[in-house]
Amino acid sequence: MVQRLVYRSRHSYATKSNQHRIVKTPGGKLTYQTTKKRASGPKCPVTGKRIQGIPHLRPTEYKRSRLSRNRRTVNRAYGGVLSGSAVRERIIRAFLVEEQKIVKKVLKLQKAKEKVAPK
């Protein structure tokens, strides 16, 4: 006769958060063991890519006590938050915006000089 199994917790619905596996104990009994959800790891909010160099853990495992800082982040601007390509894109965009401001300023000065020169 097969041994009957009963959930160890009161949560009795077969949902994603209530997944179990059957395990045989050293005493020879079969019991349910709660399985953890698989971690997908952090994603870049801009590109949607996985962030390289950071382990795939559940959100609670990223807390200070469980993971050291150098394992939680990547050593660059926006490290651990944005992917490398997104950071590169931001830097280039910021540089081009600054260049555009400088060009505008120079053109304004040249226009002012032209107005003053004919008089």
Swiss-Prot record:
A single GO molecular function term of this UniProt record: mRNA binding
Region named Disordered: 30-51
PROSITE patterns: RIBOSOMAL_L34E
GO biological process: translation
UniProt keywords, alphabetically: Ribonucleoprotein, Ribosomal protein
The UniProt record lists the keyword Ribosomal protein: yes
One GO CC annotation: mitochondrion
InterPro entries on file: Ribosomal_eL34 (IPR008195), Ribosomal_eL34_C_sf (IPR038562), Ribosomal_eL34_CS (IPR018065)
UniProt KW Repeat keyword: no
Pfam families reported in the protein's UniProt record: Ribosomal_L34e
Family of this protein: Belongs to the eukaryotic ribosomal protein eL34 family.
Protein name: Large ribosomal subunit protein eL34y
Source species taxonomy: Eukaryota, Viridiplantae, Streptophyta, Embryophyta, Tracheophyta
